Amino acid sequence: MQIAFGSGLFYATPLMDAMGNAIATPTPILLGIMQECGVDLTFDTKELFGGDQFAVDAARGMGKLTGKAKAAQISVSQWNSLIFGQTLATGQVLVSHATTPQPIPEGLSIVITPPVGGTVTGDLGVRGAGGVPFVRVLSAPATGQYTYDAATHTYAFAAADEGVQVFIDYRYTVATGNSLSVKNLPMGDMPVFQGELYLKYKGKSTYVRVPNFVSNKLGIATKQDDYTIPDFEFTGYQDEFGEVAYWSANE
């Protein structure tokens, strides 16, 4: 008797980018820290009835092949290959979230300095005691207000707020990592990949390959006290030889 246990391994090999260009040297991708994976086959069933309660015949109609996976590893590079198929760039966006307050000085202005190698790209707000937000204005801030100069990364405050403790959050970029600007492409433009699911338990193996998958969902949900597990969904279709899926097992 053959059974399976565990989440298995899922390999995705990009075949085509969103512009329809074949990948010259496809690089297989192993979805990391797999939580669960599935391949589903469903069919429409048409029933023929006469005057009695039960069908006199039934026939299979259209079929549908779908897949889904939940994997904890976060990779913009992988997401681009499997979901977007667009142009990946170097660099990433980071956020400085203040957990220690600083007093508004006598000069009424604070210049923020990002970590070494970082470039400030935007204001993410100022908070006072109890998390009460200050209101950003264009000029002449009053009590509880501030201005932000994007050119000099300077926050300015009202004279009445001198000495008040504030938390300042901002956004900055660094040269490391990856980034992706997702464009609004015409309908029908999407990457294609081959999917392979492999399960091994007690010396016996189960293998499923789908030659063509297109993604139809990427979900990222956070939890207060748990890991973020991105989930994917995809739809399969036949290759040029009419093969929809390939299965193998010990039994």
Please describe what each predicted stretch is.
Residues 19-22, 77, 162-165, 176, ...:
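Short, surface-exposed beta-strand/loop "edge" segments at domain boundaries and coil↔beta transitions
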Residues 62-66, 157-167:
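Extracellular interaction modules
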Residues 68-70, 169, 198, 233-235:
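Residue-level recognition of well-ordered beta-strand positions that form the cores
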Residues 70-72, 164-173:
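Short, hydrophobic/aromatic-enriched beta-strand segments in well-ordered soluble domains
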Residues 145-160:
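Strand-loop-strand motifs at the edges of beta-sheets in extracellular beta-sandwich domains
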